[in-house]
């Protein structure tokens, strides 16, 4: 079976995780392991605890060959290994001649 057919055939899922405690971070890693995308929002946490949580999830996702992308100071996107995250740079607009 073609990998792309497999991905599209099963449907992709995005899980939004807004932990209030460090113990909730494991849910994010488990979701990525289940081939789901995770958006982790740590705004509701104290800064030190938020950093610890983000580091834990990023390490867990990296251990299963997933990817991480910072969206803003406290929001991250985590993707499973089968998906490649890429950046689309805006095209520069040339001034009129």
Predicted stretch roles:
Residues 1-46, 51, 55-97:
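Positively charged, small/polar-rich N-terminal and surface patches that mediate targeting and assembly
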């Amino acid at each position: 079976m073609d990998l792309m057919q497999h991905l599209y055939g099963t449907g992709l899922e995005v899980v939004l995780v807004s932990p209030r405690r460090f113990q909730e971070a494991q849910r994010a890693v488990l979701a990525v392991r289940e081939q789901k995308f995770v958006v982790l929002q740590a705004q509701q946490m104290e800064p030190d605890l938020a950093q610890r949580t983000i580091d834990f999830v990023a390490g867990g996702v990296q251990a299963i060959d997933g990817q991480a992308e910072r969206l803003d100071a406290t929001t991250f996107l985590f993707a499973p290994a089968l998906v490649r995250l890429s950046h689309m740079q805006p095209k520069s607009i040339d001034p009129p001649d």
